[in-house]
């Protein structure tokens, strides 16, 4: 069996699997359980915080054969099809590659038709801010009065580029950056489940370097494990990230505290030989 990258293997399949975003999960769960369903949702936030994943889970919640619920069964044909990316009534569109008005009109032509197998036909439009003005104008009427069997879910990193007329027709949810601690705990859980040998400082380095993005963290984790030949060690992670080791860092801080310019210059020369990432170095000093 071919290797599956960690970001895909550990993609959340339920709301309970999600890391962070409790304010969004609570609102969506209550709406689903009370059957107070809106026709259009907009998820905003930086890269890798769970926008597309959340949209797919929402599609599963809406189409589970056991009924609309915040806790889909995960075992019926619809749930399995969503998880495997083959649910025909979940139409995923990358707006960045379909910016033209003709593309949007082609998409909307099928809106009137009933779902093939599911309860709802869900249109997931990723990076929706990439739509042209004409595309937004074309979708506006359908977005205002869509058929009862249609739900729109938009995801974007730049909601300021979306026209107010579109924003006003959507329920908007802003997904926050994840904290280093949240990322740290998720990485540790994954490493334990994967039976990967690691040390905790290496996890902390990756969690800080991810800048609030779980996807970036897991991509770095994949790289670091490959770099370390199946293990995760602080020295290997520092080499990968271009950061300096703790001994040099402590020496740098101590020479500053002691106002020792000669020692400071010597340490800086030693660090320079390693071609570090100076932005990362300053971040560690802070």
Language model segments and positions:
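Extended, largely alpha-helical regulatory/partner-binding modules appended to the mid-to-C-terminal parts
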Residues: 84-88, 103-106, 119, 151, ...
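P-loop/Walker A NTP-binding region and its immediately flanking N-terminal helices
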Residues: 1-172, 182
